[in-house]
Amino acid sequence: MNIRPLHDRVIVKRKEVESKSAGGIVLTGTAAGKSTRGEVLAVGNGRILESGDVKALCVKVGDIVIFNDGYGVKSEKIDNEEVLIMSESDILAIVEA
């Protein structure tokens, strides 16, 4: 994927959620609902502070994150893959193995 986010932006690929119906049928994709977990594919250089300094982001490529799927999250299709573009502040947590 050839994309470089700017500033404090992060590119995330949503992880598909798998769940089961009451009858035990495995649901995936839209039937299971949208996951708020994903893998970080790319990160920007960092947030520009009032002093002009750049503060590096806490997340890195490969991190599995839980994010707020709200107003500021933009969905884009890049190289036939759907990705999310968000600010680091939209990320709520990093899932540690």
From Swiss-Prot:
It holds the Pfam family Cpn10. One of its GO terms (cellular component) is cytoplasm. It is found in: Cytoplasm. One of its GO terms (molecular function) is protein folding chaperone. InterPro entries: Chaperonin_GroES, Chaperonin_GroES_sf, Chaprnonin_Cpn10_CS, GroES-like_sf. Its main location: cytoplasm. GO terms for biological process: chaperone cofactor-dependent protein refolding. Keywords: Chaperone, Cytoplasm. HAMAP family: CH10. Heptamer of 7 subunits arranged in a ring. Interacts with the chaperonin GroEL. NCBIfam families: PRK00364.1-1, PRK00364.2-2. This is Co-chaperonin GroES. It comes from Photorhabdus laumondii subsp. laumondii (strain DSM 15139 / CIP 105565 / TT01) (Photorhabdus luminescens subsp. laumondii).
